[in-house]
Amino acid sequence: MEASAGLVAGSHNRNELVVIRRDGEPGPKPVKHTNGQVCQICGDDVGLTPDGEPFVACNECAFPVCRDCYEYERREGTQNCPQCKTRFKRLKGCARVPGDEEEEDVDDLENEFNWRDKTDSQYVAESMLHGHMSYGRGGDLDGVPQHFQPIPNVPLLTNGEMADDIPPEQHALVPSFMGGGGKRIHPLPYADPNLPVQPRSMDPSKDLAAYGYGSVAWKERMESWKQKQERLHQMRNDGGGKDWDGDGDDADLPLMDEARQPLSRKIPISSSLVNPYRMIIIIRLVVLGFFFHYRVMHPVPDAFALWLISVICEIWFAMSWILDQFPKWFPIERETYLDRLTLRFDKEGQQSQLAPVDFFVSTVDPMKEPPLVTANTVLSILAVDYPVDKVSCYVSDDGAAMLTFEALSETSEFAKKWVPFCKRYSLEPRAPEWYFQQKIDYLKDKVAPNFVRERRAMKREYEEFKVRINALVAKAQKVPEEGWTMQDGTPWPGNNVRDHPGMIQVFLGQSGGHDVEGNELPRLVYVSREKRPGYNHHKKAGAMNALVRVSAVLTNAPYMLNLDCDHYINNSKAIKEAMCFMMDPLVGKKVCYVQFPQRFDGIDRHDRYANRNVVFFDINMKGLDGIQGPIYVGTGCVFRRQALYGYDAPKSKKPPSRTCNCWPKWCICCCCFGNRTNKKKTAKPKTEKKKRLFFKRAENQSPAYALGEIDEGAPGAENEKAGIVNQQKLEKKFGQSSVFVASTLLENGGTLKSASPASLLKEAIHVISCGYEDKTDWGKEIGWIYGSVTEDILTGFKMHCHGWRSIYCIPKRAAFKGSAPLNLSDRLHQVLRWALGSIEIFFSNHCPLWYGYGGGLKCLERFSYINSIVYPWTSIPLLAYCTLPAICLLTGKFITPELTNIASLWFMSLFICIFATGILEMRWSGVGIDDWWRNEQFWVIGGVSSHLFAVFQGLLKVIAGIDTSFTVTSKGGDDEEFSELYTFKWTTLLIPPTTLLLLNFIGVVAGVSNAINNGYESWGPLFGKLFFAFWVIVHLYPFLKGLVGRQNRTPTIVIVWSILLASIFSLLWVRIDPFLAKNDGPLLEECGLDCN
């Protein structure tokens, strides 16, 4: 894909395709090709014969094999060609081996009869080298079908790659997941367990030292072997066993030496920390049982309505607590080994074998998501510490704004200077705005004069870049009447946001766009999908699915990372951290995504509105990681492309050591005999087998697409017919694009080499057309799932239902950082959007309460998903419960009868358990008490405001069909630090918590006044009511502080609402008249006394 192709705009349905070039763009550069042959056994060049001709080992099929491997195969191997199985004939210059045909030529006697000094050092070295090598090349050959690849005669454990700096005696399998990358395979020696071990033949006349036994080298090797076994044993013990869901091991991949050690490690929470936590949860459950038994069996006759409401609310809170608490039963942490990843896949001086990654950045409105913020995110991606040819950045502009397009063009030019500067000095973070804002002494570790000089120059360059971006923003404030035009006078295709063609522009790429030092830059692609009236575009989920298809056509990396436009890469090695899980041979096969926690910049020190969400990211997510993995939170997540395509997770193979070891031998024989009988009955002739691709439907009635086994021996006509049927099925699922459908079958990624750039561009425009997803499974079973504004929950839920597991990765340095809303109104609107999405899922077909049973979803993982969609409903009992204290104080009644000693014991035990649970959670997770308390406060604030409105809006949408649109949270900020913190924006979300505050304040005043008026005996019952009211007020305190703001900026609307509500409750207070003394004596009418 060429970077200089220009902006490509078009519509597949209208058969339009236009290429708009920018002024001064050079033409496309020719692409260089190499035509050298590589040995398919060892990976070296095939080489030439002494006559200068290419060396050909097999005259039948000309399979590429070098001379050394040819001689070794004839001398020590099968003597057959790995491809056509024809016996190798002796070539001129090669030694004769048993079985060769008789030859009359005598021009090569020396080599024919192998007259060579066996003690020659070169000969010995070659023999030792060949003794540790075997044949097989992992990658598919260019132009050769997969089923024609060489098949070794001994079973191989796996495919792999050799680490060249490891001594030959330590060579081991190094798995690789790269397709077409030239993988070398070094299999373990295969030994049939049914045969006796063959002793090594030795000449009695020779000293044992000649064989290595008893020598110093032999002793050193033995000591080295023992140390390795000890390290492996220790590593296994440190691993902490298996995951709760049984993942983590693969019987086909035994651990061997350092080159085969895992790339990551699971670290369970210490039992001294987590066991008391589990015990207090069980105790709290028991106490809750006794507590509810007392509450239900002891109603309050004179306040039955208040008692009934309170009991219902408390039961709901208990159920909500169970759903939230038990998914945290198995908390774990993880550790990665980047040095092992580098040793295995990214060795210095060699071509990197790390898997390619496609980066997705989504933006909608450049006025609410400033282009400078998006530019910093893109720059941090382009400068990431990852091989350049493995990185591709796709920016989705769902608003089709020319401002975003021009800002991205400026960003690509500035990247040519910024990227080499970051990599030369290993800067962190690599987003220039945040790097230059760091309040650190940058001269502390960088004392080189060149760095100081270049840093100052780069800062000037960045300030000029900001001026250009801000000038574009200022220019975009006033839209011309005729619409925007490009530099060459062409009208901007996206002038009509709701009706425009699809647009693609490659700014940087392999064939164009090098930095100032002449080095290649990662690919940068601008994408704006087609939009037409009458089509449902599914908001962000639809945009992400369009990026999935475009990237599959152009680059098709096996892994994808999605980021919001305001989340930049704070740790340049974050992608390698994710690859430690994805490319790990032990745990990587079943991992669908690696989720990183969200961290934020620009939040005030006290985190008044719980923007950091520390409790969720550092407690809940760690607990889920011990079950089936964390839920997807919408950004900062590395996906496996195949998992997004709706494929089922690979099934785990049960190790042989775990089967039938505890059964008698006669039982094993019976089982084995029964299996053989069944196999004989179900066996089919080879002629009936055919290569096929089938789809299977899971028990949960959700289609899952899994590749079936590929068998050989099918006749050509039947095979072709089956292929046509399978192609039709795939197009029905994935859409009418043959290029994209073909890419979905490449598990390790890669693009079609036969396709031209022009055809790829045309296909890319096709897959982002507005009608491409019609009558397909996009948004239903494939990609980001539609049906909710919180598409992230549904997407992760579907993958977990297919049996995949996810991983939670918390690097020491935060992987990504973003911006969070600082003022109260924006924060409440953000929470409203999340809660509304949960309500939409609750009423959808994908509700975790009834969807996905019989699939791969774990029970406790389901608890977590159920909690994520029912939590907004807690707002109704929470609002009622927060109103009860004021009603009790105003009416003089209470929700419980007079407490006995036993009742007091249950109440005190419950309070102690609640506090103990929180303390022990903070203890094992490392969360501070400030963060924990802020989370508790905002749970009440959000519950009585945003969550409550989300419930009513969701009901309106389901019952009346009234759809509520959400607004994008503003990412811009004032120049003054924390200036947005005190900005007040009126919204109806503020009415319920404001009313609760005033109501409880009036109730407290009324209760105290009533107690003063009635004497000392009324103070006892008052304490319980006052504690209840102050519990509500303390939880709403951050809301009160945000509502009032600065003393000189108290908004008028707050004063008006306060006076209005205070007047209403004052009238109610006068009606109650608490200062009037109450006569508790007998009624005169009843006693019969006439006081007149």
Swiss-Prot record:
Zn(2+) 2 binds at C58, C61, C81, C84. It catalyses: [(1->4)-beta-D-glucosyl](n) + UDP-alpha-D-glucose = [(1->4)-beta-D-glucosyl](n+1) + UDP + H(+). One of its GO terms (biological process) is plant-type primary cell wall biogenesis. It is a multi-pass membrane protein. It comes from the Eukaryota. Keywords: Cell membrane, Cell wall biogenesis/degradation, Cellulose biosynthesis, Coiled coil, Glycosyltransferase, Manganese, Membrane, Metal-binding, Transferase, Transmembrane, Transmembrane helix, Zinc, Zinc-finger. It is an enzyme of class 2 (transferase). A zinc finger (RING-type) spans 39-85. Residues 301-302, 890-901, 960-987, 1041-1049 are extracellular. Residues 1-279, 324-868, 923-938, 1009-1019, 1071-1092 are cytoplasmic. Its cofactor is Mn(2+); Zn(2+). The chain crosses the membrane at residues 280-300, 303-323, 869-889, 902-922, 939-959, 988-1008, 1020-1040, 1050-1070. Residues 450-479 form a coiled coil. It is found in: Cell membrane. Its EC number is 2.4.1.12. Belongs to the glycosyltransferase 2 family. Plant cellulose synthase subfamily. This is Probable cellulose synthase A catalytic subunit 5 [UDP-forming]. It comes from Oryza sativa subsp. japonica. The lineage of its organism: Eukaryota, Viridiplantae, Streptophyta, Embryophyta, Tracheophyta. The gene is CESA5.
